[in-house]
Amino acid sequence: MTVAATVLPAGEDAPAYRPRSYQVEMFEASLKENIIVTMGTGSGKTHIALLRIIKELESNPHKLIWFLTPTVALCLQQFKFLSDNIPAVRARTLTSLDKVELWTEQPVWDAILKEMQVVVSTHAVLADAMSHGFVKITQLGLMIFDEAHHCMRRHPANKIMQDFYHPALERHGAEAVPKILGLTASPVVRSNRQELLKIESNLDAVCKTPRTHRSELMTHTHRPHLQQILFTPVLLDDLQVGSKTLKALVSAWTSLRLEDDPYIKKLRKSPLDGRALQKVLESGKTYCNDQLKRFATRSLHIFEELGEWAADYFIHASIEQLKARAGNSADTMGWTDEEKAYLLDIVSKLPIPNIDLTHSDPDRIPISSKFRSLLEFLDTKGEPNFSGLIFAKQRATVSVMEKLLSIHPVTKHRFRCASFVGWSGGGSKDVLGELLDARMQRDTLSEFRTGQKNLIIATDVLEEGIDISACSVVVCFDKPPNLKSFVQRRGRARHRQSTYAIMFATDDESSALSKWEDLEQAMIEAYEDDERRLREAWALEAINEEVVERLEVQSTGAVLTADTAVAHLNHFCAVLPRQPYASNEPEFSYEKDDADLLRGTVTLPSCVHPGVRRIQGQRWWQTERAARKEAAFQAYKRLYEFGLLSDHLLPFKRNLELKETDLTNLPALVEVSEQYDPWVDWACSWSSPDVHQTRIAIKHNGDSRMCIRLTSPTSLPPVEPMTLFWDSETIYTLDFDKPKRMKEIAAESIENMRLATALYLQAASSRQMRPEQDFVTLFGPDLTDLELAEWLNKHAGDEPALEVYSRKDFPTVMGIVRDRSRYNEPMLFKRWVVSGQDDTPIVELECDAVPKRRNLLHRQTLAAKQPDSETPAISSKIRLILAENCTIDKLPYAETIFGRFISVILDRLEATLVATRLCETILRDLEFSSIRHIITAITAPSAQSLTNYQRYEFFGDSVLKFTVSCQLFFQHPNWHEGYLSEGRDEIVQNSRLARAALDAGLDAFIMNKMFTPRKWSAPLISEKISLTPKQRTMSTKVLADVVEALIGASYIDGGFAAAHACIHRFLPEVNLENIDRTTAPMPKDGVTNHTLNDDHLMAHIGYTFTNKSLLVESLTHPSCQFDTTTQSYQRLEFLGDAVLDMAIMSTLLSHPREIPQGLMTKIKHAVVNANLLAFFCMEFALTEKRTNVQVTPTGTVTLNPSTEHIELWRFMRYQGAHLQTARDLALSRHSSLRGSIIHGLKHSPSYPWKSLSQLNADKFFSDIIESILGAIFIDSHGNLAECEKFLERLGLLRYLRRILKDEVDVMHPRNIAQQMAKGEIRFEVLRVPNEGGGGGEDDGATYRCTVKMAGVDGVAVVVEGCLTSEEAEITAAERAVEILVGRGCSL
């Protein structure tokens, strides 16, 4: 699947947006009073309106905002601008395209405006709706007048103000009327001061133009070069030698007989229409007569303006159009069949002109002098990046000029032409001469913006407001009718070194010509005056003003002065967390007092706490330079006082708040203490023993077999039951009774127990026991002291096999058979085999080998093969041994096997004792309900035990990250996300945790030695007492892992309280319990409402915010600069990231099946994948009801209910066209990939890695998921269940459960390929710049991945043309897997 690439990368180098200072100045002025923003075309007036709308939605969300424009085209443009920048706003347009003139019932208007927030319409629509009482002035909270200079005389804009606004203002005061914001580039039409005052009075507003930032305004508005184009006008005689068709048309019209007109004939037939007939005969006006008159007049005008070929084309095309319309039965022009026939008869008699659209000889296309002058001018403007606009007076001229330029040899290969006449009806009632309709110009403006078209011919509809690309050439084919048109058209030429040309006839009256020359001179003088003021400003800036400010930190001697403050402030901002599409530069602005002195204000990036984000200077200065210095000094001083700088007056590079004395990184391997040996303590305890005994009940496949006593010199902790696997069919279960203290025990009894222990150990071994029998731990049968002595006498030692044979003992009471000819090899007795004569029999023993398994804690990996029931199996392990060479132990085999259990019992008992000692020392303040959790947490994987710390370490990692994140977030409300991340990283990094483990002495309790029963020997008192302490080498990662595993064990055993206590034990600086979390750090008061419908959004999220400001903050992107009281979502996203980890961890932990740590890590990596979160963000949509009006051809108005899906991403508050472009391209990819991703998530047995990599969503999509989680967590006072509800509604937890239930394969394709290839595979990803892209970061580069593997000469796989390196790697890996499968490889 091919998906469009994002042209602008969502990386760190993505362009940032920030409102220009003068835009902010005008926005802030609009909050204080009603104003008319007066700025040049292209200087960003609409951005000011956007900021004002957002502010009004926040502060007054229950009233309607009405955006008024003079044209339908401008309505559609402004609506698109608002929808693109505030995508979740409930907005609509009301124009003639909606046939609002037919909405004559109040319920229709009520339904349409219900729950609307912004309406964009023409002035006439609102004026008419108000005049009929459908819309009340009190419903409106803000009215925005685009092109505000129209608010004069009888214009609908002025009607709104005079008939409704001013009367309500006089009667009820300012609270009863909306606020006013006007936008204009030319506040006066006729350059009259009185008109300016009148407009201000009409709009109840004052004109404002940026003053403080005038130089910046001039920087962003480029003045064009004014040029005259002279032409010779058409003489009357030219018509006599010109077009035959035109002359015939004029003749046909002038020679019309009124009596032949179908309308006259109809009136003569009706006696009731005599009066009407008389009126028509006197005026001579009929439908057909008027149509022909206008057609002829337009044709003459075309001839005068463009020439003979143009007039012929216009006439011919119009006639062909008339014929098509006459044959269309669905045409609703209201003319009769007789009138159709009459007009067709007249025009059909005109001579057919010779229209050739493929002429290559310009001389064969007769044109006017005026058009020739235009061609000569355009011929000098054919630069590669040309973009032009030609204004013409009449719609007919526009359509024909576009065709003429498109086919003329001089221009057809140089210009890509289009026409635009707006969306009004124009001459829609004409059946002749109206060659343009709305459908033909639907894509004109967008094609011009993208460069598909580079020359537009338009009427004055493009003078005002319409957002089109800055042009290098603007031509007035007809003189501007007034100053307003002159200024508006001039504003379209905004390219650097652009040209603004006006066409003049050579016989133009000198007074008219001098008027434009005088105006041009006045403009030049005005430009020069601006430049003079700019030079004066630079001269003023050259004044040397000394700013005497100084801050000294006594503890370090660090000094800050006004001269160094700007550089320091720039450095502070430069090291802030970088975000795509957001600027990290400080912004300086200035205000003037009455004495023309300046005071500076600095605004820092939105990630900085609102308390210090905007700082104002304390003094007034003559120069901006001094004001900047002083403002920077005050800002940097406040940053220090706010705790965002170190005592060295530098941004924190290390988290000094942790007050750690040694944060140096440890080497990968360190020398640590040898593992704690509990047998040493027990050996010492035998000198003055406190004897305890516990009874071990042994069951064989569930049936009780025997009981053994374990004797220890000190108290014995509770020992959990053990399961031992003798073979594939035999399982022994060992249950340990509660230990009992023995009051007194005789030395003889101790000695007998040592003998019994030695007997058990020797019975199961072929090795000769050592003579020492001072065992640390003693075992014996469950007998009294007297019975034990008798038992030893009966079962100690062995006897010849022949004696046992002679007694005919039952096999069940026989012991181990030992072959003296083979070094007393132990065998299992099967049966006696007797051969030879009765007087000299040969007695043999059929024996089986004793199982060699020693580590009985693990199941056999391969079950023993079962013999066929009909064919006796002959095992190679069965042997016949002469009885005379054998001895048989007196200890029955049923008791002998216990000797094999002793090593396992002591190994598990040792682990229990180590864990118990750890609980009694380092973890003495923690209470664990089960020692099993501690054993698991301190057992390294290298021990190859039944359990190890890996699962617990996985859980502990999430709990630790979550706890530290919470503490830093609540403890440091002044820290931005960069400090929070750095602080967390320092606390949870392996070197810090390893150091904590060493400082606490935890290293001695980590069990990393593998249990090897064959090398095992029973611990002896004499050996243990003489041991000297040793050291061992251990990985710092193991040390850190055990700390995290103990945290995980604490959480599993006792929840968050236990986990927090465990964390505090190893990391004293982390003490979440002592931090007040009941009151969250709240944003400043002032933003109490979101820009959109909070209630609907919260209902869809599934959580109702007590503090809605948190919801606002969670949706505020770092590029959002207009709200300095709300911090960007980065802090909340930092916290939400940890909350998400906890939610996933909790789900994995609660799953009934115990999931291995490696698989849990893969699952977590898949579920928190940024592209998956982004996909859920794009899918998560609330449904809102809308009402649409449908007008039937008969004029009937019906209301049709509909629903609209509002996705979560639409609620994000942001600024900037580059972010908007990246967002829209990501959404386009989402639309293309949506089906495959949904199928993968719902049905696929594997994770949709490839489809998600192709989505390549910008990070802000996933960020707002995490920031909302953070906001819910804070507002709910740390209730994780509320966060999980949101994740459930989002669909994330539902998919996680499907992964677990259906065992979805989440392994990354690259890892699959590497495992299948046994590591003999190599991936190489290369970024391939687009040759025509200019080589920058946004050059449309693609990625290529090559794969090399063993057994393949050269490159095995090559993948090219991918949008991201991840997509390239995944695609290549999938192809590599296909090759490996073909070879027969498998995982």
Curated annotation (Swiss-Prot):
Domain Helicase ATP-binding: 26-205
UniProt-annotated binding residues for ATP: M39, G40, T41, G42, S43, G44, K45, T46
Keywords from the named record: Antiviral defense, Antiviral protein, ATP-binding, Helicase, Hydrolase, Magnesium, Manganese, Metal-binding, Nucleotide-binding, Repeat, RNA-binding
Enzyme class: hydrolase
Presence of keyword Secreted: no
Record-annotated Dicer dsRNA-binding fold domain positions: 565-659
Important for activity (site feature) positions: K1259
DEAH box (motif): residue ranges: 146-149
An annotated Gene Ontology molecular function: metal ion binding
Family, as annotated: Belongs to the helicase family. Dicer subfamily.
Name of the protein described by the UniProt record: Dicer-like protein 2-1
Organism encoding this protein: Aspergillus niger (strain ATCC MYA-4892 / CBS 513.88 / FGSC A1513)
Gene: dcl2-1
